[in-house]
């Protein structure tokens, strides 16, 4: 087991890629702390991990709030005394933003300030806050690994507006963090998957008339 005795935080672990990543980390021997807003989703992830012989706990947090991100880190340290791995997966593209568009993209100038801020807060602010509070712990330890989940949409000029901007920001933030933390024995990387078969992706595909799109699985990413 490659992750035996390691403590891993997985954000957005209630479903989709986050759940698959939590299960994969646990299968490799890590003690997994699952984090998301919805406790019932976390309960199911923890149940699946334990059912397969793994070790897991859960923390319900709104990670767009800096105080709650700090509280997450404090709670993990109180429980386990260290943080070896952070999987920065929390994010999303709320369906209320694209519902009723009749397969039409939101052009850049059509985004409301509220919509734009919501997407940036969910997809870029959360990974920033998690790194902000986890990295000092890893520096003290002299080691750690961080993996953030970006998207193919963050690497191209896409029709997804703020979502693409946020996911592209993750790539740049990852490169910055990697350069600034390498002297402390910390490795920072990102993955940028294409379409992944998750509940949210299926809803989005239907809204834009792509029900027959070929998708990868969350396990592929994990």
Residue positions per predicted region:
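Conserved glycine-rich cofactor-binding loop
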Residues: 7, 14-16
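Alpha-helical segment proximal to the catalytic Tyr-Lys
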Residues: 136, 179-180
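The beta1-alpha1 cofactor-binding region of Rossmann-like NAD(H)/NADP(H)-dependent oxidoreductases
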Residues: 40, 60-72, 113
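Catalytic Tyr-X3-Lys loop
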Residues: 92, 104-128, 143, 147, ...
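Active-site loop-to-helix junction immediately N-terminal to the catalytic Tyr of the SDR YXXXK motif
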Residues: 157-164, 176
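C-terminal helical subdomain
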Residues: 183, 190, 210-222
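Conserved glycine-rich Rossmann-like NAD(P)H-binding loop of the short-chain dehydrogenase/reductase
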Residues: 28-44
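Active-site helix of classical SDR
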Residues: 131, 166, 174
């Amino acid at each position: 087991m490659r992750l035996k005795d390691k403590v891993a935080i997985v954000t957005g672990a209630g479903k989709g890629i986050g759940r698959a990543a939590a299960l994969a980390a646990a299968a490799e021997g890590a003690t997994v702390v699952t984090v998301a807003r919805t406790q019932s989703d976390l309960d199911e992830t923890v149940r699946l991990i334990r059912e397969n012989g793994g070790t897991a706990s859960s923390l319900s947090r709104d990670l767009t709030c800096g105080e709650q991100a700090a509280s997450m880190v404090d709670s993990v340290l109180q429980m386990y005394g260290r943080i070896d791995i952070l999987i920065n997966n929390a994010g999303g593209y709320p369906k209320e933003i694209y519902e009723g568009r009749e397969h039409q993209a939101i052009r850049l100038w059509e985004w409301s300030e509220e919509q734009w801020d919501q997407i940036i807060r969910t997809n870029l602010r959360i990974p920033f806050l998690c790194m902000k509070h986890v990295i000092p712990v890893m520096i003290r330890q002299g080691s750690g690994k961080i993996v953030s989940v970006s998207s193919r949409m963050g690497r191209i000029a896409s029709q997804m507006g703020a979502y693409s901007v946020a996911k592209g920001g993750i790539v740049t933030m990852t490169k910055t963090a990697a350069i600034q933390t390498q002297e402390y024995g910390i490795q920072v990387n990102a993955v940028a998957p294409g379409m992944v078969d998750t509940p949210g992706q299926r809803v989005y595909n239907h809204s834009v008339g792509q029900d027959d799109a070929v998708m990868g699985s969350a396990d592929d990413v994990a």
